[in-house]
Amino acid sequence: FTPWKYKAGMHFGWFQVTAFQHDKHVAAYGGGQTWTGPTLISSFPDKRYNATYLHQYYRADRTPPAGNIRNYPSAPWRGGMGSSHPYLFKWVEKDRTHSNQYNSQNVVAMRYAELLLMLAEISNELGNGQEMTFLTPVLTRAGLTPRAEYSQGQSSFRDAIMEEYQFELIGEGEDSFHNKRRGYQYFLDLSLIHISEPTRPT
C-alpha cells in the first residue's frame, strides 16, 4: 500500500485517510494551535502523526527538488481527488530503494495498544477507577498527556476513548468491531465525521 512513485519498484494500490479524520486527530492533540504546512506538522506533539500520515514526498525516480508530491495538508488547496487527503503511511514500504512489486510486510492482527484501550474503556464503564492505568501507557508511548476529556466524567471519557481507537488504530481494520459495540446511533452521531463543507472534495 505504497503511494505512487514513493519507492523504486512498480506497485499498485494505496490507502488515504480523509482530510476530516486527519483534522480531527490534529484538533484533539494540537494544543489549540493551528497546525498547517509541512514545517509545523512535522513537529506535531503526537508521535503517531508521522507514522500514520504521509502528505509530502519526492518521487523515487526524480532528483529533488523535481518530483515533489504534495497532498493535504501540505497541499491545503485540496484541488483534486488525488491530493485532497493524506496517504496512510502505516503500511507503506519504507525502503525507498525497494525494487520489487511485492514485499513481505506482516499484517497486524491485534496490537497490545488495542487491548489497553479496551481495558480502559471497560474500566470506565465499570466505574472501577482503573481506566487511566490502562490508557496512560498508550498516550505515553505517543508522547502525550491525557487531554481534558479524560477527566470530565464517564460520558466524556467514553467519547474520548472511542476517538482514541481511531487515532491509534486507523487503517488497521478494527473500526467495525468498536462501532458495532457502541451501536448504530452512536456511530451516526459521534463516530462518523460530519462534513460541514459538502462542496469540497471528499
Identify what each model region corresponds to:
Residues 43-196, 200:
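Acidic/polar-rich alpha-helix caps and helix-coil junctions
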